Amino acid sequence: MKNVKPVVVKIAETKVDPAAMETVLRTLGVSEASIERFLTVRGTDGQMLTEFAGRMCYESYEPGLNPNVTKIREEPGEYFANILMKGDGSVIEHGVVSFAFLNVSRVCTHEIVRHRVGTAISQESLRYVRPRDVKFWIPDELAPDQAKAMTDAVEDI
């Protein structure tokens, strides 16, 4: 029998791309002040990415961005404590690799979720984001009257 000693070696780590995060935040309509606050280094890149992914589900980057979110926990420690208390563990998985799919259909995200192998999925919550605030894509191929009918139908919901 060979005598061995346990060894832990970090062989890879998550790296945040601040420019990509900024693009997502701007696309969501987050204010300059909140973008600056969020992009200030907050712990490890894995922690920052995890927080980013979790906040994306609820559009909870700042007060007023999502009218259904009544309390914004600005400090990462307080934010993570709340996530863990609620049992929202899926956002913790984002410490490996993450993609932001913006302005895609539920059909698209459903296919991504169905074929997830070793990936974490966090999706905009339809319980917390008002249906009239959900973005949707209208194909250019639709005639203008069809696009208007589709838009009117969504507005009526």
Listing of model-derived features with the role each one plays in the protein:
Residues 1-157:
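Family-specific signature for flavin-dependent thymidylate synthase
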